[in-house]
Amino acid sequence: MAKDDVIEVEGKVVDTMPNAMFTVELENGHQILATVSGKIRKNYIRILAGDRVTVEMSPYDLTRGRITYRFK
């Protein structure tokens, strides 16, 4: 998948699940299942419920995403 094809949206973490999975509520009200990107995992950045995050989504599956940034 090319980098141009991703959809970036902001959302809020609603729930944490096992295996570094999170339920994220997007700005438009939809809820998706998101996982943590490699750089966040590598740098041990903690993500908790209530955090604002940026999520990358594939245009082919709009129910899953990858958390790429946690706002301070």
UniProtKB/Swiss-Prot annotation:
Subcellular location per the Swiss-Prot or TrEMBL entry: Cytoplasm
PROSITE patterns with a match to the protein in the record: S1_IF1_TYPE
Chain ranges of the S1-like domain: 1-72
Transmembrane segments: none
UniProt keyword annotations, A-Z: Cytoplasm, Initiation factor, Protein biosynthesis, RNA-binding, rRNA-binding
Chief site of localization: cytoplasm
Similarity section: Belongs to the IF-1 family.
Protein name, per record: Translation initiation factor IF-1
Originating species: Streptococcus pneumoniae serotype 4 (strain ATCC BAA-334 / TIGR4)
